[in-house]
């Protein structure tokens, strides 16, 4: 669960490096006091469950830009079961859909296309095996996406590693192939997150269930005392 969660998180770094989709990262972000006031973030945060993405949209509305500083990436060590990882990624996906739709759409379209083509490739192989119809072998070429996905993961790992603070690069290098081999699973999980976040507006965090009605309206649905 922890490895999959880490791989899933690492997938956000290319979006951080792209000026069109870059956004504040809750683990390490800074803003000038005067910009904070101009964006009215104190009031916005009183009604939101996301601090980083509301900050992102607030700054963009002022016509200002966000700067991604790789040296400020904060690394945390935490265990996570598969269930906890799924809950976390579902929550983050829904938050991005409500607060930063461009990021959600970019992620949704990319992973949906990749995974649907892979599924089509698998189905083509099964149908060819059952019927012997050679035409389905053409569809099976979609499975070439898997090795391409692994090659991309190798390239992305090297790029991401270079962005991290020097003192932890050795630890990350030790897990190189763990990241690469869990990349396809992280992509499938992202598709699951997309479907889940498209079907609901509720998240549960520390025993409290919230409904995200809009970027400026969040209500408490229930809480476990």
Where are these regions (language model features)?
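Membrane-embedded multi-pass helical conduit in multi-pass membrane proteins
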Residues: 107-201
């Amino acid at each position: 669960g922890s490895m999959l969660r880490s791989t899933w998180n690492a997938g956000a770094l290319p979006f951080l490096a792209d000026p069109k989709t870059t956004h504040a990262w809750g683990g390490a972000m800074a803003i000038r006091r005067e910009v904070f006031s101009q964006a009215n973030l104190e009031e916005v945060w009183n009604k939101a469950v996301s601090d980083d993405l509301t900050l992102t949209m607030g700054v963009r509305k002022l016509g200002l830009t966000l700067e991604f500083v790789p040296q400020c990436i904060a690394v945390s060590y935490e265990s996570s079961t598969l269930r906890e990882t799924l809950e976390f990624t579902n929550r983050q996906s829904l938050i991005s859909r409500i607060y930063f739709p461009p990021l959600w759409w970019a992620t949704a379209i990319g992973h949906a296309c990749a995974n649907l083509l892979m599924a089509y490739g698998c189905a083509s192989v099964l149908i060819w095996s059952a019927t012997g119809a050679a035409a389905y072998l053409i569809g099976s070429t979609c499975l070439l996406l898997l090795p391409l996905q692994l090659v991309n993961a190798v390239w992305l790992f090297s790029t991401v590693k270079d962005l991290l603070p020097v003192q932890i690069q050795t630890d990350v290098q030790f897990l190189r192939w763990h990241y690469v081999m869990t990349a396809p699973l992280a992509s499938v999980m992202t598709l699951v997150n997309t479907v889940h976040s498209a079907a609901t507006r509720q998240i549960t965090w520390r025993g409290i269930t919230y409904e995200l009605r809009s970027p400026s309206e969040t209500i408490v649905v229930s809480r476990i005392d």
